[in-house]
Each structure stands twice: as structure tokens, then as C-alpha cells.
Amino acid sequence: MAIENCLQLSTSASVGTVAVKSHVHHLQPSSKVNVPTFRGLKRSFPALSSSVSSSSPRQFRYSSVVCKASEAVKEVQDVNDSSWKEFVLESEVPVMVDFWAPWCGPCKLIAPVIDELAKEYSGKIAVYKLNTDEAPGIATQYNIRSIPTVLFFKNGERKESIIGAVPKSTLTDSIEKYLSP
């Protein structure tokens, strides 16, 4: 997911998408349009044909390639009764699930920590949150008696539970345990 996001062009770098569409009427049917190529975080422009460079030189000058990998996980995704099996039990990577409720003060305290961990371990683990008010069946199935509770799953199997608003290091230690084969 992060790799796909890293290769997308921002709206200011719409040379290959919107900008090309708006200038298609200037090109001959046999003309080639060269768009920026991805080379890390630097932009690189292949040689432009004379028809493209003469029709819109400024368009290429102000465009830029933007890596959106840091935005791949903006927030932890919700999981519910209908998505639980697919996202948690059938996941090919370890899963961390935060059981929470909107009225829970300690849940609000740990939420930013869960968000940070989701960003730090993006692509290595899947991180979800489950609102116990909206999915009480799953909370009951896994004996969730206090919130926040964080459960860890690997290969669809429950491995560990951590109860309460714990320090980030406690969760990090648990994540690291399940990353090794």
C-alpha cells in the first residue's frame, strides 16, 4: 500500500494525468507524451518532444513528484462484525486490535499512541480499532471486560492481550515479538 501511494503524483504534479488530458488537442495522434519518472524522492524528466515542450513548457516546470507513503496510514481503520474475519482472522501479517468506546477516557489517551504505532509499523502489521458499543459480540467472544484492551493476533490466532492505557514501549515490545517468524 505504501509503495502504491509513493508512486502517485500529487495534483500539482498532474503532468501524466489531468494536465496531459487538457493538452491532448495540441498533440498529433502519433506523438508521445513523456511524464516524470520516479527516482526516489527526486524528480526526473525525460527529454521532451518539441510538440509537447512548445505547447506547455510551464506545465512541466511547476510539477513535482510527491511521495505519499507517510500518508498511507492516516488513521487506524475500524473493524466490525462484518469485516472481522477478513481483516483480523485471515490476515497474512500480525494484527493489533484496539478495543475502545467513545465514552472511555483512557481509550482517548491511548488512541494517539495506537495511531503512531500504525504509522511506524505500516506494512509490517495491520492495526485496527473496534468500537465495543457497535460490535459487542466480538468483544464478548474475546472476553473483553475492560477497555481499552489491545489484542494481538498472528495467523488468525489470539496471542496476547494488554489491558489499560499502557506506555508506547509496552505495545512496541509486543509488536516486535510477533514480527519475528
UniProtKB/Swiss-Prot annotation:
Tell me where in or outside the cell this protein is found: Plastid, Chloroplast
The record's section on PROSITE patterns has: THIOREDOXIN_1, THIOREDOXIN_2
Annotated site residue numbers, Deprotonates C-terminal active site Cys: 98
**Residues the UniProt record annotates as site (Contributes to redox potential value):** 105-106
Keywords from the UniProt entry: Chloroplast, Disulfide bond, Electron transport, Plastid, Redox-active center, Transit peptide, Transport
Domain Thioredoxin residues, every copy? 68-180
Q: Does the keyword Mitochondrion apply?
A: no
- Transit peptide start-stop: 1-67
Q: List the disulfide bonds.
A: 104-107
The residues annotated as the active site are 104 (nucleophile), 107 (nucleophile)
Q: What does this protein do?
A: Participates in various redox reactions through the reversible oxidation of the active center dithiol to a disulfide. The M form is known to activate NADP-malate dehydrogenase.
Its family remark reads: Belongs to the thioredoxin family. Plant M-type subfamily.
Subunit and interaction comment: Forms a complex with heterodimeric ferredoxin-thioredoxin reductase (FTR) and ferredoxin.
Q: Return the protein name.
A: Thioredoxin M-type, chloroplastic
**UniProt source species:** Spinacia oleracea
Instruction: Please name the taxonomic classification of the source.
Output: Eukaryota, Viridiplantae, Streptophyta, Embryophyta, Tracheophyta
